[in-house]
Amino acid sequence: MTPTLARFLDQHGFARDQLSATGPDGRFTPLMRACKEGRLDIVEELLTLGADLSVLNSDGCNALWLACYHGSHAIIQRLIDAGIALDNQNGNGATALMYVASNSKPDLVKLLLENGANPALRNFDDFSALDLAASLECLKLLKKAA
């Protein structure tokens, strides 16, 4: 473990010997926090050390959702390459693709679709990413993929 990772873990209240455990509030694992903050260096080291990609936070989201929140293409692609569940549905049935479409992030819609995200999935309110698209660009990308 590098000193940089050790500082990151300490700063956010994570145990150094439980790299896949959620912190005291149950909202983030170290990997999720690093994704949310756009820390590719920390993401890389955590993956190298075996951080579990299947862990979900209290909302049912995996680290991909937090990477999409930040918007780092490099982190999103790294998680996908490492085998993260691209179509994980959270506690509301929403996927990362639905999130980026509803937040008008067409570059991320394109990235997720190119990597195999399923645009046909529906959340628990029966909406798809296409239904939730918040911009014309997102709408066009999703219609083309449908």
Question: Which residues are covered by each model-predicted region?
Answer:
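Intrinsically disordered, low-complexity regulatory segments in ankyrin-centric signaling systems
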Residues: 1-37, 44, 48, 146
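Ankyrin-repeat-protein effector appendages
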Residues: 1-12, 115, 124-146
